[in-house]
Amino acid sequence: MSTIKIIKVNATKSTNSKLRMLIKSKKIHNNTIISANYQYGGRGQSDKRWFSSYGKNLICSLYINIPDMRQSCLQNINFAVSLSVLKTVKKFINNSTLIKWPNDILSANKKISGILIENSIKSNKVYDSIIGTGINVNQLVFKSLPKATSIKKLTNKELNVDIVLYELIKNYNFYFLKIRNTKYLLNQYNENLYGLNKCKFLLEGEIVKGKIIRVLENGKIRVEIFSH
């Protein structure tokens, strides 16, 4: 990746949507990040809402175009992004921090970060990607979200959100240089996988007994279900 341009806004419905709008109007170029103090329509995987207090957390989206990226290697983007966010969070806390498949980050068994990746595909190639990331930095109260946490909640230390952003950009640069190295990215991802070899986990909202074996090259997770 080349130098990343940072655009800061006070508030927006969604940093992903804001980026997409700017891309369509041709007002931004490759390797641009939008960072917001607040977003009032943020969402995560499966259209779940992402709630964040004003100015307390890192809310950002990266626009990137990877030349000649085949659709068959699409999961490499998720691997690289998940590892980038994981490494960023681990920079600031000592608690156990892992990737919950497909791309949530958990610290001390609670969600500290969420990722939403939107890819445009043309002629079996990834035309561009918008990578939305939320990292809970200084927020202490999470109404109706008992399984959420933040860096400050775990360390009792206030952080400048921009410092977290710059660390994330540094890690994006590191892992996107390895974007075509599926073996490296997948090994790193599996080494940091939450619930690996675990005997109980949630599957489609139900607690089942089984064992998470690993994540595969296509991004799917291999699970061994124990018979009753």
Residue ranges and their predicted role:
Residues 10, 99-101:
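Short loop/edge segments at beta-strand edges and connector loops
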